[in-house]
């Protein structure tokens, strides 16, 4: 089969690789009909994620048709149309029983590797390093899905792929981020970033009762999408000081909730800390660039909440924990427990409360994947979200 494979920093290729096979009796094989490039895939593309190996198959936002099931799979059959969550979860461990699916104790075969870096191992993730399981990803023609009774959700309606594909990751991720923000009716929420996840954060904030949503970015097309589709007020951080503007917009109090939907590759408009972060990364003296998280902590009102769906992979320098502590902030974060949200969010799509396809700007063939990575990474051609059709 054809697959998009990682071969190093900025080096993604279309390779011919063996088709996946049933390994465990709880596996299923899915023929991919649509798959997406995620913003967190760019952390791999940019070389930020350790334990990647040349030839690793990328991708964790897939859907398709079940073509084979293991002998112990009971909920799926050949021909079923499914969306596959990016997290791989067993369904029966301590954490899965608490619906903390991204904390699954069972699904990561390289748990010892993850423990050395994190203290404990999270769940395995498709196409996202050997530290997180070394699983082949979904930017391919076929995908092996472990624990197939636990992960995939069946799509029984005639909704097109583009409307349901993002149940695999970014819609649940945006929704959980808004949920983690502990929004109360009428709250003002500031969202850093206007990429694909942030667009669903914005939509979800309204669903959960926000009174105002303020979106912060510098890319015109992304700000426009946040304003037109997300009905958000916007701040271009290259044109205005974010802290000063947020204070002016909130009568000096600050937003009730701040959401970092950017993560480890944050940019700043020439601020000293942002420049220093980039210099440290260039000299291999640091990993993540936490400018946005610092700014969110400083801007959030006293007693407020900072939600962090943005991905971080290593250590953060000069995080203002004194400000967070003395302001009494709550910080909530984590990989998304996708399986928890699949049914209720699918229901919202089926009831026309939201059409997730609004975020798609580019729909391409799998062979165009390498160029699509570059276009997405460089924010060229108005690119916000790429869907690949094998």
Swiss-Prot record:
It holds the Pfam family ADH_zinc_N. Its EC number is 1.1.1.284, 1.1.1.1. Binds 2 Zn(2+) ions per subunit. Keywords: Metal-binding, NAD, NADP, Oxidoreductase, Zinc. The keyword Oxidoreductase applies. NAD(+) binds at residues 193-198, 217. It is an enzyme of class 1 (oxidoreductase). It catalyses: a primary alcohol + NAD(+) = an aldehyde + NADH + H(+); a secondary alcohol + NAD(+) = a ketone + NADH + H(+); S-(hydroxymethyl)glutathione + NADP(+) = S-formylglutathione + NADPH + H(+); S-(hydroxymethyl)glutathione + NAD(+) = S-formylglutathione + NADH + H(+). Its cofactor is Zn(2+). SUPFAM superfamilies: GroES-like, NAD(P)-binding Rossmann-fold domains. Zn(2+) 2 binds at residues 90, 93, 96, 104. InterPro entries: ADH-like_C (IPR013149), ADH-like_N (IPR013154), ADH_Zn_CS (IPR002328), GroES-like_sf (IPR011032), NAD(P)-bd_dom_sf (IPR036291). GO terms for molecular function: alcohol dehydrogenase (NAD+) activity; S-(hydroxymethyl)glutathione dehydrogenase (NAD+) activity; S-(hydroxymethyl)glutathione dehydrogenase (NADP+) activity; S-nitrosoglutathione reductase (NADH) activity; zinc ion binding. Zn(2+) 1 binds at residues 38, 60-61. CDD domains: FDH_like_1. Belongs to the zinc-containing alcohol dehydrogenase family. Class-III subfamily. Oxidizes long-chain alcohols and, in the presence of glutathione, is able to oxidize formaldehyde. Also acts as a S-nitroso-glutathione reductase by catalyzing the NADH-dependent reduction of S-nitrosoglutathione, thereby regulating protein S-nitrosylation. The enzyme is equally active with NAD and NADP. This is S-(hydroxymethyl)glutathione dehydrogenase. The gene is fdh.
């Amino acid at each position: 089969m054809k697959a998009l494979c990682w071969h190093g920093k900025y080096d993604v290729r279309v390779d011919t690789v063996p088709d996946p096979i049933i390994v465990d009796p709880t596996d299923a094989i899915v023929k991919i009909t649509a798959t997406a490039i995620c913003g967190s895939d760019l952390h791999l593309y940019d070389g930020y994620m350790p334990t990647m190996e040349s030839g690793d198959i990328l991708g964790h936002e897939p859907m398709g048709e079940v073509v084979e099931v293991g002998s112990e799979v009971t909920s799926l059959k050949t021909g079923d149309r499914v969306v596959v969550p990016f997290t791989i979860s067993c369904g029966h461990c301590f954490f899965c029983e608490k619906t903390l699916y991204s904390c699954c104790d069972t699904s990561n075969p390289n748990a010892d590797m993850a423990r050395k870096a994190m203290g404990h191992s999270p769940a395995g993730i498709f196409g996202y390093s050997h530290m997180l399981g070394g699983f082949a990803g979904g930017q391919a023609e076929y995908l092996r899905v472990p624990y197939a009774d636990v992960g995939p959700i069946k799509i029984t309606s005639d909704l097109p792929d583009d409307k349901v594909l993002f149940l695999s990751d970014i819609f649940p991720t945006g929704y959980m981020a808004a949920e983690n923000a502990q929004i109360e009716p009428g709250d003002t929420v500031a969202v850093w970033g206007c990429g694909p996840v942030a667009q669903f954060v914005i939509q979800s904030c309204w669903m959960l009762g926000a009174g105002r949503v303020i979106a912060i970015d510098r890319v015109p097309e992304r700000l426009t999408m946040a304003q037109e589709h997300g009905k958000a007020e916007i701040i271009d951080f290259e044109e205005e000081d974010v802290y000063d503007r947020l204070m002016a917009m909130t009568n000096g109090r600050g937003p009730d909730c701040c959401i970092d939907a950017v993560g480890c590759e944050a940019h700043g408009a020439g601020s000293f800390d942002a420049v220093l972060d980039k210099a440290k990364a260039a000299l291999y003296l640091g990993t993540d660039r936490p400018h946005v998280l610092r700014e969110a902590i400083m801007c959030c009102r006293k007693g407020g909440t900072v939600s962090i769906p943005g991905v971080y992979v290593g250590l953060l320098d000069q995080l203002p924990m004194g400000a967070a502590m003395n302001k009494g902030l709550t910080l909530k974060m984590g990989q998304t427990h996708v399986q928890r949200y699949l049914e209720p969010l699918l229901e919202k799509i089926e009831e026309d409360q939201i059409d997730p396809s609004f975020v798609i700007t580019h729909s391409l063939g799998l062979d165009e994947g390498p160029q699509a990575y570059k276009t997405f990474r460089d924010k060229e051609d108005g690119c916000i979200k790429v869907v690949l059709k094998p």
